[in-house]
Amino acid sequence: MILTQLPAEFQAAKPIIETIEAAGYEAYFVGGCVRDTILGKPLHDVDIATSAFPAEVKQLFKRTVDTGIEHGTVMILDHGNGYETTTFRTESGYQDFRRPDQVTFVRSLKEDLKRRDFTINALAMTANGEVIDLFDGLADMEQGILRAVGVAEERFHEDALRMMRAVRFASQLGFTIESQTEQAIADNAALLAKIAVERTRVEWEKLLMGQHPVAGLTGLLTTDLYRYMPAMADQEAMLRQLMALPAWHLPSIESTWTLLSWTMQRTDEAAVRQLLKTWKTSNELINHVTAAIKALMALKHNGQLTAQENFYTGLEALKTANQVATILGFGQDQAQLVQSYASLPIHDKHELAINGGDLLKAKLVTPGPMMGQILAACLQAVVMKQVPNQQDALLDFARMVADSKNH
């Protein structure tokens, strides 16, 4: 196969390959960028593999960075964008099922490609667009099949995360996992527990945000791989619930975890926090999801949100909640929801026209819990449009609240 119309990303990187070839070495575009070009998908990274050893690559270019030189990877900066260029290599000794004990640089493209995970990722392409397919990846791609390169069990022992990558690709591409590859995942599923939670989480999120999530979830269930994911061992029913939803697509990591928390019935704040901490997500994501879940509960039970609920949820978490509510069948009109939020008198407590200093100055309170209570009452009154957000009006209101608390 020869690709005649190469995307601009390849055109920009061609001088790298041409420079390496002019010095007498081989160099190719490899992996996901070749796969995605053939499938007509947008490119993320352009990766180059070469027969030149790292020291030889560095001699050919003026600006390089050793991004992973022990594994043969050098970043070349000579042509604007940085391009990761990796020496052909073989790997051996995977005692931790994650990374090789030994990397050996070689001059053979075939030796390099045969250590890759799946046939559709074991493709190389020349600077002129000629695809080199040594493991029938093109035929598998045409048939929508995900097949391990060589012996599947060996590939999964080299890096157990490849099992998660298999179900993730099934979701993203809508491909079927080939039977021997699927059996090898089932036989070795327990190895996933040896993988860092953060690495598993990235694949899990990508699976759920794929265009064909049911294909990925089916793979998890068929192989029992889900049993070795954090907090998932007893979640078969939840996975089947997700699969039974009408066609759905999750647009963000935030909506992904909101849907998961909801479907796992983790709806109180402590349970949401515990789930997301188990998966080692950021505190920012935890705060977003807890706010979205509260809004989702209100949408489910009341069909709409009060001004106060809008205010405390915040616009981004509101959008997330409504995206998930739409998947679950009780979403609201998104534009209307955004408009309701926009019409709030204020959108942040710091916009309140008075603060503790103003209360002290007006001799309405002394420092202590009462000050916080009065400010909270003022905030609520402004959000509910009971009092305008003006200092004089709020001081009058604060005086009234203080009087009621003193009697």
Curated annotation (Swiss-Prot):
Class of the enzyme per the UniProt entry, highest EC level: transferase
Alphabetized SUPFAM superfamilies for the sequence: Nucleotidyltransferase, Poly A polymerase C-terminal region-like
EC numbers: 2.7.7.72
Keywords, sorted A to Z: ATP-binding, Magnesium, Metal-binding, Nucleotide-binding, Nucleotidyltransferase, RNA repair, RNA-binding, Transferase, tRNA processing
Statement: the UniProt record of this protein carries the keyword Iron-sulfur: no
GO MF terms held by the record: ATP binding; CCA tRNA nucleotidyltransferase activity; magnesium ion binding; tRNA binding
Residue positions binding CTP: 32, 35, 116, 159, 162, 165, 168
Residues annotated for ATP binding in this entry: 32, 35, 116, 159, 162, 165, 168
GO biological process: RNA repair; tRNA 3'-terminal CCA addition
Binding site for Mg(2+): 45, 47
Reactions it catalyzes: a tRNA precursor + 2 CTP + ATP = a tRNA with a 3' CCA end + 3 diphosphate; a tRNA with a 3' CCA end + 2 CTP + ATP = a tRNA with a 3' CCACCA end + 3 diphosphate
Cofactor(s) this protein requires: Mg(2+)
Pfam family, one: PolyA_pol_RNAbd
Note: A single active site specifically recognizes both ATP and CTP and is responsible for their addition.
Family stated for the protein in its record: Belongs to the tRNA nucleotidyltransferase/poly(A) polymerase family. Bacterial CCA-adding enzyme type 3 subfamily.
Quaternary state and interactors: Homodimer.
Entry function: Catalyzes the addition and repair of the essential 3'-terminal CCA sequence in tRNAs without using a nucleic acid template. Adds these three nucleotides in the order of C, C, and A to the tRNA nucleotide-73, using CTP and ATP as substrates and producing inorganic pyrophosphate. tRNA 3'-terminal CCA addition is required both for tRNA processing and repair. Also involved in tRNA surveillance by mediating tandem CCA addition to generate a CCACCA at the 3' terminus of unstable tRNAs. While stable tRNAs receive only 3'-terminal CCA, unstable tRNAs are marked with CCACCA and rapidly degraded.
PANTHER family linked to this entry: CCA TRNA NUCLEOTIDYLTRANSFERASE 1, MITOCHONDRIAL
Stated name of the protein: CCA-adding enzyme
